[in-house]
């Protein structure tokens, strides 16, 4: 009697209430997962292609192929002292990371093979990269153009007739996407700022390719 007096032994009704509470807590979580209402924000992403072998062809790592092909090559660093692995399109190929980034900074280093080349930067890609936005880095440093596309439909949204003097050197390009505003920078200088008020795409993956160039140091950083 004394032992039972000091030990809190749960009654049957209390056990049932605990089970009911567990069910009540689990059902909404399962529902959120099934309906897609609950979504985990993707973490930051970085790839300098050093973990792959020279000659590897996409898909590799987290990269998927949208069209054409991509391969890993080794080229001399800018100081010509070491070999550096980079990603190169095959037949103007495009590869992409299939994640739902909403607000983010997307940074990539690009080096044209020839001054006439026009590589591209893709972002907020959806539907297996069949829709989204891209920046066209025009050849001969003529400028930059922001496009929105859906399948074969392509719409020019904004452009800059000024451009950084990249030539055939590695240059750092950056896209900042927050809500429906898009900012494009080259070498830290802003060249395009555009607000898409016509059914904007507010989340999606990122991609590279669409023109002859070396790509390196691809980075995506979510922003608040």
Swiss-Prot record:
It is a single-pass membrane protein. It is found in: Membrane. This is Uncharacterized protein MJ0945. It comes from the Archaea. Pfam families: 3keto-disac_hyd (PF06439). The chain crosses the membrane at residues 21-41. It comes from Methanocaldococcus jannaschii (strain ATCC 43067 / DSM 2661 / JAL-1 / JCM 10045 / NBRC 100440) (Methanococcus jannaschii). InterPro entries: 3-keto-disaccharide_hydrolase (IPR010496). One of its GO terms (cellular component) is membrane. GO terms for molecular function: hydrolase activity. Keywords: Membrane, Transmembrane, Transmembrane helix. The lineage of its organism: Archaea, Methanobacteriati, Methanobacteriota, Methanomada group, Methanococci.
